[in-house]
Design a protein with these regions (language model features):
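Catalytic glycan-binding domains that act on GlcNAc-containing polysaccharides
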Residues: 1-145
Length: 145
């Protein structure tokens, strides 16, 4: 699915590592599920955007294929929305578009209104830091596509 959504597979691995530690049965405290840790609200929205019906259920996110398909699609949408900026897209993947859009309107968090330059929430800051650090390690180990 990385190729289908024009994503670097190493970036996808970074999200999977950060989100679930490669555990397909992972469930978070907010009931996000699967390798790429998706909430039901996000899953239902993406299922509709993908033109899929009830043949794919929220519980199917425990299937690695389903989780990676939906996670890659969502990551693709985040990267498109935030002009390819990995840190801003990661913040949106983690905290939602509404949160990131609101932060982009504040000068203390965005110098240009397009990318985040400051992360006001510790959890968001640590999440983005983990994604970028992991991606850096993977690209050093395996190169860039």
């Amino acid at each position: 699915y990385a190729a289908e959504y024009d994503l670097d597979p190493l970036l996808v691995y970074s999200f999977i590592r950060t989100e679930s530690g490669f555990d397909p049965g992972a469930t978070s405290s907010v009931d996000a599920r699967g390798l790429m840790q998706m909430t039901e609200e996000t899953f239902l929205w993406l299922r509709s955007k993908l033109g899929l019906g009830e043949e794919v259920s929220f519980g199917d996110l425990y299937d690695p294929d389903v989780s990676i398909r939906f996670g890659c699609y969502y990551l693709h949408l985040c990267l498109v929305r935030y002009n390819g900026d990995i840190s801003t897209a990661a913040a949106a993947y983690h905290s939602g578009w509404g949160t990131v859009d609101a932060l982009l309107q504040k000068e203390e968090h965005s110098e240009d209104g397009l990318t985040l330059s400051g992360f006001p929430y510790n959890q968001m800051h640590h999440y983005v830091e983990k994604i970028t650090a992991c991606y850096g390690v993977y690209t050093r180990l395996y190169g860039t596509p």
